[in-house]
């Protein structure tokens, strides 16, 4: 369905509230004495990762590293994308070895993007642990992947979910429909 018939699940204030709650949950779970890296899956995951780092720093977290991960070459549907595949740069300026990694994305649906991100991450090294943060979780897994931290859940698998963020889209809302 097009976005014209979509319902707004979260407006800007709802996204802010979900991110605020996620930051609180993540802060409470951070291990002591282990370096932490927060990595967003390009494109909207990187925006959400930046927001999380800002919120965590505001709450007193220290030493957080932030990066972004391009998963294009790790996707299992790359052949289907053909020449339309757009490669973006992975920007992780820290060693992932032995680090507690918080992987961030906007929507978790089939699990295939997260699988690609995990493959890309382990090609960079061996993190101590990887935790998954998702703004919107929806049913429809094709792989056994679950989020550790979820902003909001959509119960129906027959609806499309569109996340718009000011930094990348000029608008701030989550639409379903």
Task: Give residue ranges: language-model regions.
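PRPP-associated nucleotide enzymes
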Residues: 1-177
């Amino acid at each position: 369905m097009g976005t014209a018939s979509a319902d707004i699940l979260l407006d800007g204030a709802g996204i802010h509230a979900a991110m605020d709650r996620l930051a609180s949950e993540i802060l409470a779970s951070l291990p002591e004495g282990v370096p932490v890296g927060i990595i967003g899956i390009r494109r909207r995951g990187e925006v959400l990762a930046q927001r999380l780092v800002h919120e965590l720093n505001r709450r007193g977290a220290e030493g957080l590293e932030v990066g972004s991960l391009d998963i294009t070459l790790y996707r299992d549907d790359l052949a289907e994308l053909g020449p339309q595949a757009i490669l973006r740069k992975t920007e992780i300026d820290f060693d992932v070895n032995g680090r507690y990694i918080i992987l961030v994305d906007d929507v978790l649906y089939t699990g295939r993007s997260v699988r690609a991100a995990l493959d890309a991450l382990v090609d960079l090294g061996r993190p101590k642990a990887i935790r998954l943060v998702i703004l919107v979780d929806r049913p429809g897994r094709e792989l056994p992947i679950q989020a550790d931290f979820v902003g909001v859940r959509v119960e129906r698998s027959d609806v499309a979910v569109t996340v718009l963020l000011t930094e990348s889209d000029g608008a701030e809302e989550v639409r379903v429909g």
